[in-house]
Amino acid sequence: MAQWNQLQQLDTRYLEQLHQLYSDSFPMELRQFLAPWIESQDWAFAASKESHATLVFHNLLGEIDQQYSRFLQESNVLYQHNLRRIKQFLQSTYLEKPMEIARIVARCLWEEGRLLQTAVAAAQQGGPASHPNAAVITEKQQMLEQHLQDVRKKVQDLEQKMKVVENLQDDFDFNYKTLKSQSDLSELNGNNQSVTRQKMQQLEQMLTALDQLRRTIISDLASLLSAMEYVQKNLTDEELADWKRRQQIACIGGPPNICLDRLENWITSLAESQLQTRQQIRKLEELQQKVSYKGDPIVQHRPMLEERIVELFRNLMKSAFVVERQPCMPMHPDRPLVIKTGVQFTNKVRLLVKFPELNYQLKIKVCIDKDSGEGAALRGSRKFNILGTNTKVMNMEESNNGSLSAEFKHLTLREQRCGNGGRANCDASLIVTEELHLITFETEVYHQGLKIDLETHSLPVVVISNICQMPNAWASILWYNMLTNNPKNVNFFTKPPIGTWDQVAEVLSWQFSSTTKRGLSIEQLTTLAEKLLGPGVNYSGCQITWAKFCKENMAGKGFSFWVWLDNLIDLVKKYMLALWNEGYIIGFISKERERALLSPKPPGTFLLRFSESSKEGGITFTWVEKDISGKTQIQSVEPYTKQQLNSMSFAEIIMGYKIMDATNILVSPLVYLYPDIPKEEAFGKYCRPESQEHQEPTDPGTAPYLRTMFICVTPTTCTLDLPMSPGTFDSVMQFPGEGSESGNGNQFETLTFDVDLPSECAASPM
């Protein structure tokens, strides 16, 4: 089915967008009348080659004539009238610039294809939510769209005035030359000069009208350029700047950035209007060369107008060249802007001016630290070479929406080795994870006689040589993008600015919400604030230095706040993601708050919190019980670290955990997850079900194997009567373990037993 026919079957919301694609410059009636022929032509090629554009344009006029003949046979007067009007408009507008109409048609066809793909994708996903324009348009953006429409209307109005002034000038030129030839003949024949004087007066009136119209056009052009400048400032200094800031926030775990498509449509529309206006200004030069006079406003103002429109277009093109996807290693998608030497990373650039004639015309080159040069050496920073495919041609085929982009998928960095191990200066004040580097993308655009150098940069990246440097490198990325929107401040960490707790708290919550389904609660953040700033009532506005966040050890600990927190984030992602998403892990809670929550609860109530003493990240559970006298006791088990969680899931540990009482009986102290969720309801679904089938001996005469399960046991007394091996007895006698957390209640050490189960009761919980 032809593309145009498919478009007619779309929902109303898509048809409204289709109507917005067409204007007087390429009427929708013509698209309807000649749909199959239009779709069969290579308009993008015509937009880049004038000879082919001329051929296609004349073929278009021929197709219009054939269609007109059909309407003539059908006696369809209305369609005849519309088609005749369209042909006259095309001839008067594009006969001398056929590449212009080719570019307009090519863009419309691209936009149609993108709209069709969007509609199909939305239908497959079950609704309009997947639509790229589904994002809410603010009142400010609605005003911006209105300003863009006003600009387009002014451009079209000027186009009509240009035709009027051209016709008036042609009439004046013809009458002037006619009068001049008649005057010369009259002088030779000695005829009466009164007729000549009368015609001279008519010419003067025509010249006055021509001058007035020229001045009106000059004034309108100046007003139009001011309107364009206003819209462009809104687009580049506000909308595009806002998008870049949102991209920064998204890079460090904040809300996902919005799609660039709407911004691309706005910028492309403005660029098209600017190019059309430039053609109008150049047309003024042609008119001036044909007819000029003393005080001609074209002579006075045209050079300034052309210089101004060219400058606007250059600046718009430069601003429209952006990094759509920041550098990122595929194995660490949640931590962009950190690159390890020798490991491939990807990034993507995009030009937000979607001209089909630029498809496969722009060759992008990528380099690193282009502007640093000797400055980097003075700072003592390392230097790198980019390996892999570091050049690529921008095209519209690789992207889903037909945008003009280039994606680099196979880039790696290699350090330039110096005599002192790559450091250009042994007095460097920054550690390697505080060094910031810029990846630069550059190209040249040749369009309608203009050469424009385009250059854009990634956000600053941190380059590491060992994956163990990742935590500190990511801390640098967080701190930078949290506190500045300067995209090129590579000296940021020579004097890192101070952050406030409000800023830090938001970013810390993002570290959880970006990789899980749950961020941090106010109570959890308050506990973290206490870890960073000490006891307090209100932490809002409290200042936090870079050193306190990442470099200095916490009070009484041998590690920094960030190292501790980053390991806990890793612990959650790798070992207890589902439990965190369910909200079962309180995690960050003070000892005092923990006791206050558990004390009024019935025995067996427990909660899950993170260890404060484990650098590598640990989690423990604390429960409430009653002693013989009925006094409330708060007990905690020694934290489980990644080493133990590699062997058994945390849910299985909780479900199987026992304590050994004074009579050597194994009992479970964990009954209800705080506040009152039965343990089996919370954790049972996350335990691996016992297989009903088990391997039997191949020899029929051999007794069946006994099945086994692992359970964690905490002894409460050292006078154990249960028969056990000497090794197990020695382990029990070593209780309590060294390095356990102190604080509220007793800290229990856990023993792991391999218990034999008869096959008939193997599936029964203990």
Swiss-Prot record:
PTM annotation, UniProt: Phosphorylation of both tyrosine and serine residues, together with dimerization, is required for mesoderm induction.
Gene Ontology biological process terms, A to Z: cell surface receptor signaling pathway via JAK-STAT; defense response; growth hormone receptor signaling pathway via JAK-STAT; interleukin-6-mediated signaling pathway; leptin-mediated signaling pathway; mesoderm formation; neural crest cell differentiation; positive regulation of DNA-templated transcription
Keyword Transmembrane: no
GO MF annotations in UniProt: DNA-binding transcription factor activity; DNA-binding transcription factor activity, RNA polymerase II-specific; protein homodimerization activity; protein kinase binding; RNA polymerase II cis-regulatory region sequence-specific DNA binding; sequence-specific DNA binding
GO CC aspect terms: cytoplasm; nucleus; RNA polymerase II transcription regulator complex
One of the Pfam families matching this protein, by short name: STAT_linker
Chain positions of motif Essential for nuclear import: 150-162
Location in or out of the cell: Cytoplasm; Nucleus
Sites of Phosphoserine modification: 725
Keywords recorded for this protein, A-Z: Activator, Cytoplasm, Developmental protein, DNA-binding, Nucleus, Phosphoprotein, SH2 domain, Transcription, Transcription regulation
Highest rank taxon of the organism: Eukaryota
Domain SH2: 580-670
Function: Transcription factor that binds to target promoter sequences and activates transcription upon il6st/gp130 stimulation. Mediates ventralization of embryos, at least in part via inhibition of smad2 signaling. Required for hairy2 to induce dll1/delta1 and promote neural crest cell proliferation and differentiation. Involved in TGFbeta-mediated mesoderm induction in early embryos, acting downstream of map3k7/tak1 and nlk.2.
Record family assignment: Belongs to the transcription factor STAT family.
Further comment found in the protein's record: Involved in the gp130-mediated signaling pathway.
SUBUNIT field: Forms a homodimer or a heterodimer with a related family member. Interacts with nlk.2.
Record's protein name: Signal transducer and activator of transcription 3.2
Species name: Xenopus laevis (African clawed frog)
Gene that encodes the chain: stat3.2
